[in-house]
Amino acid sequence: MPKYRSATTTHGRNMAGARALWRATGMTDADFGKPIIAVVNSFTQFVPGHVHLRDLGKLVAEQIEAAGGVAKEFNTIAVDDGIAMGHGGMLYSLPSRELIADSVEYMVNAHCADAMVCISNCDKITPGMLMASLRLNIPVIFVSGGPMEAGKTKLSDQIIKLDLVDAMIQGADPKVSDSQSDQVERSACPTCGSCSGMFTANSMNCLTEALGLSQPGNGSLLATHADRKQLFLNAGKRIVELTKRYYEQDDESALPRNIASKAAFENAMTLDIAMGGSTNTVLHLLAAAQEAEIDFTMSDIDKLSRKVPQLCKVAPSTQKYHMEDVHRAGGVIGILGELDRAGLLNRDVKNVLGLTLPQTLEQYDIIVTQDDAVKNMFRAGPAGIRTTQAFSQDCRWDTLDDDRSNGCIRSLEHAYSKDGGLAVLYGNFAENGCIVKTAGVDDSILKFTGPAKVYESQDDAVEAILGGKVVAGDVVVIRYEGPKGGPGMQEMLYPTSFLKSMGLGKACALITDGRFSGGTSGLSIGHVSPEAASGGSIGLIEDGDLIAIDIPNRGIQLQVSDAELAARREAQEARGDKAWTPKNRERQVSFALRAYASLATSADKGAVRDKSKLGG
């Protein structure tokens, strides 16, 4: 029978000092036999996805204590990728994931907490907390802040839906008037919550459902809707049950590594491919799998991408649907239901509610459930009122979207595409693979060949795109922006958005060892591995080299002879200490980022730290 971890600090005469300090936090004699549960919050006023979380930790804590636990809250950092985008701040985004994971480990282990409720939401916060949860392997439930309502405005006598990416594209489009750009900017992000499309934050929050670590509705129920409060109330009660199951009944099925098994990771990736999720999810799932000591690799993702169709299409791949529409169509469970009927899921998995996948689908899939309360929850809709307050409205759609032929979520027979929304490509400068979000690629450019325009920083590429130096047919190559080379693996949302602004969204390709925002669409290929800074062949590409992209056949090829590439590699190595570094880039890199770069692996490993350098 496992012993409560917290007993280390609450029992025995030699822990009198620790108990004295616990008493100063409000604990009493009656509390010293109860489980201590960490409420891991991420409130900040910097990030719209987290601005409403201040009081939600208290809400969870009250439920924990009512159920017989002791709740202790702390906060992690949270970087807003959208605000950090397009300048030096983006260097810090991905590294913040490791800091978040480490900070959770530090706090939980330093104070011997028994379990956790993780209140996350945005791009690196959910992955960081997920990595920590699987590293620590103590009972955990995730409950995120929820998606933002889609923006809406009237253009050309038509009401259209908007999000952050629209503001970026219109702001850079010289054909758009100042007044229209301002109108879109003011309408794009109307409420608190994670940006309203299937961007990285919402993708990851959806995947926690498929991993079994959050409750049904977590990925899609709007931040502003009153129904979301119930997820927080349930999490506080349920975590105490899970904690007691493990520590008092020796039931290891309550532990996250036994819930988020390899089968669950395969289900999560299957969901990701089917819903056209952000390419960043590949990085984060690979990283989380390593923390769980699960053998889940790019090869597994490649195999899944070849058999899973696209059953859901959401912004940025279309402007017709946003997360509020996914929820109306049944949310994550709705997509999982269609995947299950297609025979594409592992059914022998459970979630934090203790339900198997078939049981979860029977209760929560709107196509089969008989539960009116569940159907009512999935009718939760937007209010269209600007607010930073959680649970501030209770509007509902008149009807559910259960049309699996033409609705937001489709059945296998009516799939948007027989190929899924993500693909792994391999070739002579991506020997370990690269990732493309096929959901956002126009059919006309699934095969594409063009001359390379090579840039060794995102800034130089942006200047060239906006300066008219990139023309139709070009393949823009941005290198030395990987985890080690950036350092920090910047997102390339501005270059891809500016290609659209210049009318080149369907006429050019962009390839990088960096990564993309979940808001990216177009022929945008990232995570090229090995990265240039690690001696990857992307560092050998020269201006004018022809690059052939073949998404249907999962290929990407630099059309240069092996002999020529060998000669270029020899010349690169001859640069000595300067080998595999950018030639003409001035960038101030802090000590903190240099420390990150010294241990960073390429994207095919999840951009995690190289344990071999630490003796691990």
Curated annotation (Swiss-Prot):
A GO BP entry: L-valine biosynthetic process
One Gene Ontology molecular-function label: dihydroxy-acid dehydratase activity
Keywords: 2Fe-2S, Amino-acid biosynthesis, Branched-chain amino acid biosynthesis, Iron, Iron-sulfur, Lyase, Magnesium, Metal-binding
Binding site for [2Fe-2S] cluster: C122, C195
PROSITE patterns named among the record's database cross-references: ILVD_EDD_1 (PS00886), ILVD_EDD_2 (PS00887)
Enzyme class: lyase
UniProt feature coiled coil, ranges: none
Top-rank lineage group of the source organism: Bacteria
Cofactor note (record): Binds 1 [2Fe-2S] cluster per subunit. This cluster acts as a Lewis acid cofactor.
Residues annotated for Mg(2+) binding in this entry: D81, D123, K124, E491
Cited Gene3D superfamilies: IlvD/EDD C-terminal domain-like
N6-carboxylysine, modified sites: K124
Subunit text: Homodimer.
Full protein name: Dihydroxy-acid dehydratase
Organism, scientific name: Escherichia coli O1:K1 / APEC
Name of the gene: ilvD
